[in-house]
Each structure stands twice: as C-alpha cells, then as structure tokens.
C-alpha cells in the first residue's frame, strides 16, 4: 500500500515531555525543540529528526545517569509510538534546584 504519514513536531515534543515527567530527578522540562523532516512513507523511513531538550534537575541525582536514561527512554518511546528514529537527542541541563 502506498501512502504517507506526517507526524507534527508537537507530537514528538509531547512524547518527549511525557517521558521526561516519569524520570526521577528531573524537576522540570524548560524547553523542547525539534528539527528535521517528520515524514515517513509506508515503504521507507525518510525522517531526519533532531531533538534539543533543556532541563532543570534536582540536587542529589547524578546528571549523567539522568540524562542518559532520558535519551534512551525518549528514543524508545518515539520509536514505539511513531516508528521514527531520532538522529540525535541533545540534553542541556540549564538549571538545578534543591531536592524537596
């Protein structure tokens, strides 16, 4: 069957945000930017997806552990929900708050 599926950047950003909300140690997601073609045909994958995520983390957590987990889980959730692969998921920790 021929056809095309287009997935909006808002969908990718929502999947990323929902995933991040489930990770312990992340205080809040400040900004998510996506770029690339969010397009897939039934017969071949033509996406070129890049995601930039800006986070605030809580003290007492290892930043490398949290961010690596976030990258893996976001990639997995995007792949399972949309069939798309991200070329890059860049995470920037731009603030830290005391754990409450």
Cite the ranges covered by each PLM segment.
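Short, non-transmembrane amphipathic alpha-helical segments
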Residues: 63-82
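Short beta-strands and strand-coil junctions in structured, solvent-facing domains, enriched
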Residues: 3, 60-63, 81, 98-100
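Generic non-transmembrane alpha-helical segments
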Residues: 15, 19-23, 73, 77
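A short interface-forming secondary-structure element
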Residues: 51-68
